[in-house]
A protein has these predicted regions:
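Amphipathic alpha-helical "coupling" segments that flank catalytic cores
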Residues: 1-241
Length: 241
């Protein structure tokens, strides 16, 4: 139902009505009002200041349609280049990112991509699963970086946050990056950086002087005071969040 309006002469004459007209068609056929709204909104967002879908059916349909298009184009190797994006795939990717972040949804992007690839292959469109998935993840990651840059997140924070976490949970990455971005401009943020650099330099000096190997696994049995135990517990509590 969400694409039937593409066959109408009215949408052929006025392409900007696609989706909107589909919502009216769905309403005329007796579909639930939330379904009609989802059909009318599934192309959103269509611009920088465009509204985004907010209701569950609308979010689900908008994301499904966008990931289906992205997987399809990447599957047949019609990817955007640095100078050309004839199918507006960057806009689709940014649209997905905005829908997820502004609705505060935790969605595993890689699972969506792989499921869409599976559906294509079931229709005998045998895309290269690994290459298509990898290329699309990289593409979405780049769009996500651009989104954060437009939100005035520092470039070093963008790079560190996207390299430290899996792209599957962009909401988690964005929240952490935004928190760090806000904190780092304050006195407490500068203090944290100073402490981290000091500790890091001490470790590097000890490694170089004594030819040590540093493990990333702490041994609580070696702790000598309560400060170490409390710090260890706090780090683990934060990691669970």
């Amino acid at each position: 139902i969400c694409k039937t309006d593409l066959l109408s002469d009215l949408v052929g004459e006025f392409p900007e009505l696609q989706g909107v007209l589909g919502g009216y068609f769905a309403e005329a056929q007796g579909f639930d009002k939330d379904i009609c709204l989802a059909v009318s909104e599934h192309y959103l967002p269509i611009g920088t200041d465009s509204q985004i879908p907010k209701k569950p059916y609308s979010i689900a349909l908008a994301l499904s349609d966008k990931i289906d298009s992205l997987v399809g184009f990447f599957g047949i190797n019609l990817k955007p280049t640095s100078s050309k994006d004839p199918y507006a795939l960057r806009r689709l990717a940014i649209g997905m990112i905005k829908i997820i972040l502004e609705n505060r949804k935790t969605i595993k992007l890689r699972d969506l991509i792989n499921y869409s690839l599976q559906l294509y292959n079931e229709q005998n469109l045998n895309f290269n699963l690994e290459n298509t998935s990898t290329d699309l993840v990289v593409f979405l990651k780049d769009r996500f970086k651009n989104y954060m840059k437009e939100k005035n997140v520092r470039q070093d924070i963008i790079e560190s946050s996207t390299s430290s976490y899996n792209i599957d949970d962009i909401l988690k990455i964005y929240k952490k990056a935004n928190t760090l971005n806000n904190m780092i401009s304050k006195d407490i943020g500068l203090d944290v950086i100073f402490i981290y650099k000091r500790a890091s330099n001490i470790l590097i000096d000890e490694i170089n002087k004594n030819n040590l190997e540093i493990s990333d696994i702490a041994d609580p049995g070696l702790f000598k005071n309560d400060f170490e135990k409390k710090l260890y517990k706090k780090i683990h509590d934060i990691r669970k969040e």
